[in-house]
């Protein structure tokens, strides 16, 4: 994509927009000239994100005043674990006349627990939020993108897509599904003007990763954990350059070959040691 300002002529849709990286995606996409569709289950957080974006756009010294008047937002309060979540989101954007040019499937959940110890409710939730709803959102919006000859889809996979480890296995399993269907869809969309990009994040400094402040600071200093701002910047740059994927963080790239080679016996030993400290979900 040319890095030209879009003059608020098209929409970017971001799930998980009420806080964290989702909020940052919305801000950065608005700065690129996109109207924004914000999706989250948290209505209060969506309102806060809307207010923050509106303030930033109106305060911008680089956007002409007459162009600022074109800026629009649509907030959709939606539980992404519901079977009809994608249908509800699509229906509301169609009713509002939103031409979605950028889709960011950002929403996610994370926990550390073995499959047998995880509640059925949580297993269903993580599969719906990471697999079912993002896939169906891709399916619903990609057709119009292809018809227009322009579209960008950013799916959030993970370094964990290569880590079938007990404790984080279900998180990794769902992210592996994201990785693989994104590749298939990218190949299907060749020569159409539509690209699909995967972000393979390792540890990002967000509340999704439960760490004490001292350990969080240590992880940042060791470059094991990156800031959400850096993660979003790398992901969006890769998206608009139509790259297949991006894996921010030098150590992620360094350790990736070793991660996939860890033997089952070592993983089993580590899980047995860690199991007493894992939280029931």
Q: Where are each of the predicted segments found?
A:
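Conserved NAD(P)H cofactor-binding loop of Rossmann-fold oxidoreductase domains
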Residues: 106-111
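Canonical Rossmann dinucleotide-binding motif of NAD(H)/NADP(H)-dependent dehydrogenases/reductases
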Residues: 2-37
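SDR active-site lid
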Residues: 188-251
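Residue(s) in the substrate-gating loop at a strand-loop-helix junction
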Residues: 158
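Substrate-binding pocket helix/loop in short-chain dehydrogenase/reductase
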Residues: 114-127
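Active-site helix of classical SDR
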Residues: 138, 174
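Conserved glycine-rich Rossmann-like NAD(P)H-binding loop of the short-chain dehydrogenase/reductase
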Residues: 34-48
């Amino acid at each position: 994509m040319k890095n030209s300002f879009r003059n608020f002529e098209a929409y970017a849709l971001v799930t998980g927009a009420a806080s964290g990286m989702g909020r940052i995606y919305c801000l950065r996409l608005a700065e690129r000239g996109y109207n924004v569709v914000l999706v989250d289950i948290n209505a209060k957080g969506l309102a806060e994100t809307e207010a923050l974006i509106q303030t930033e756009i109106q305060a911008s010294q680089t956007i002409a005043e007459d162009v600022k008047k074109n800026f629009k937002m649509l907030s959709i309060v939606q539980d992404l674990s519901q079977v009809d979540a994608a249908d509800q989101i699509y229906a509301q954007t169609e009713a509002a006349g939103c031409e979605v040019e950028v889709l960011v499937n950002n929403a996610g959940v994370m926990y550390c627990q073995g499959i047998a110890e995880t509640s059925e409710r949580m297993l269903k939730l993580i599969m719906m939020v990471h697999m079912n709803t993002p896939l169906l959102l891709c399916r619903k919006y990609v057709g119009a993108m292809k018809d227009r000859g322009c579209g960008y889809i950013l799916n959030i996979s993970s370094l964990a897509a290569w880590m079938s480890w007990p404790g984080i296995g279900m998180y990794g399993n769902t992210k592996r599904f994201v990785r693989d269907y994104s590749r298939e869809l990218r190949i299907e969309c060749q020569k159409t003007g539509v690209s699909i990009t995967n972000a393979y994040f390792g540890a990002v400094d967000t509340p999704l990763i439960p760490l004490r402040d001292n350990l969080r600071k240590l992880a940042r200093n060791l470059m094991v954990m990156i800031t959400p701002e850096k993660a979003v910047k790398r992901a969006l740059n890769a998206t608009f350059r139509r790259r297949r994927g991006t894996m921010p963080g030098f150590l992620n790239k360094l350790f990736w070959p070793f991660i996939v080679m860890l033997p089952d016996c070592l993983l089993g030993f580590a899980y047995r040691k860690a199991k007493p400290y894992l939280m029931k979900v």
